[in-house]
Structure formats: C-alpha cells, structure tokens
C-alpha cells in the first residue's frame, strides 16, 4: 500500500482541500465538511499520492474517462501511471469545432470512470450515459472520496461498481480526532 487512508485525509487537510464547517454542495445538500479535490490537485505531491491511491483500487479496463472539470487532473496523471488511454467527458457538446462531447475514443471499449468526489452519483451517471451513447461500456467507477450519500447505490442500479480511496467515515474520523487533539 502506497499510503494509508488517514495520511491521505491529513494531506487534504494540510493543503486546505478538506474543510469542516457548514457548506452547500453542488447537489444542493448541506454538509458539515467540504472536499475540494481540484484544490488538492494543484499540489504535485498530493496529486501524486491521490493518483497512486486510485491506482491501487483501479479495476481492469481499456480506457480511463472522467467528467470535466474535477476529474481532468486525476484522469490525466492516472492515465500516464496506468499506461492506459484517457477520455474527458464534457458537460455538454461543444457548439463549435468538432461538436463532440467526449475527447478520446471510447467506442467498443471497456471504460473505467474516474472522478474526484461522489455524492449522489449525478455527474458519474451523466458521464456514463455519454460514454454509452458513444458505444463505450462502463462497469466500474473510481473516486477519491465517496461521500456515502447514494452514489454507490445509484451506480449499482446501472450495473456499475463504485470504488473509492476515502469515504465520508474516514473524513469524519479525522475531524473527530482533530477535535479531540484540540481538547
């Protein structure tokens, strides 16, 4: 194992990518913590550690694909480390140029979805639909953090297994340890 879960969570906290407080998520839900993997990815050592950890849980596949914006640095570095081609799934088709929604070739390939954080699974499901429309097959998804708020179940209903490096329980455990240490 490259690095334990607790140390990864500590690294996120150290670079300001893990915050505790009162936050509104993109899903509209409120949360007592916020994970900003995009911020974490701006720190080379953290990006390296996160992608090493993702590599450990990465299932077999032909192509790695992730939705813009959060997955782009992760899928890029992971592609190099795994020696696999990558694809980026845009939120919507471009209105100019080629007009494509997916950058990279997924047609007829087994695609592993990669993302930063999974809450309800909405962005992963949107990426899944785009990949399937282009003729790709998705059976697995990997994320840095599973917030344990329905993504695993939503993906399972579509025949996709979700693996994560960290969970909400891991992050709350760190928060509780920090609170205890401060007394």
Swiss-Prot record:
Pfam families: Pribosyltran. Its cofactor is Mg(2+). Keywords: Glycosyltransferase, Magnesium, Pyrimidine biosynthesis, Transferase. The keyword Cytoplasm does not apply. Orotate binds at residues 119, 147. InterPro entries: OPRT, Or_phspho_trans_dom, PRibTrfase_dom, PRTase-like. CDD domains: PRTases_typeI (cd06223). It catalyses: orotidine 5'-phosphate + diphosphate = orotate + 5-phospho-alpha-D-ribose 1-diphosphate. Belongs to the purine/pyrimidine phosphoribosyltransferase family. PyrE subfamily. It is an enzyme of class 2 (transferase). 5-phospho-alpha-D-ribose 1-diphosphate binds at residues 90-91, 94, 115-123. Homodimer. Its EC number is 2.4.2.10. It comes from Methanopyrus kandleri (strain AV19 / DSM 6324 / JCM 9639 / NBRC 100938). Gene3D superfamilies: 3.40.50.2020. The keyword Ribosomal protein does not apply. This is Orotate phosphoribosyltransferase. GO terms for biological process: 'de novo' UMP biosynthetic process; pyrimidine nucleobase biosynthetic process. One of its GO terms (molecular function) is orotate phosphoribosyltransferase activity. Catalyzes the transfer of a ribosyl phosphate group from 5-phosphoribose 1-diphosphate to orotate, leading to the formation of orotidine monophosphate (OMP). Pathway: Pyrimidine metabolism; UMP biosynthesis via de novo pathway; UMP from orotate: step 1/2.
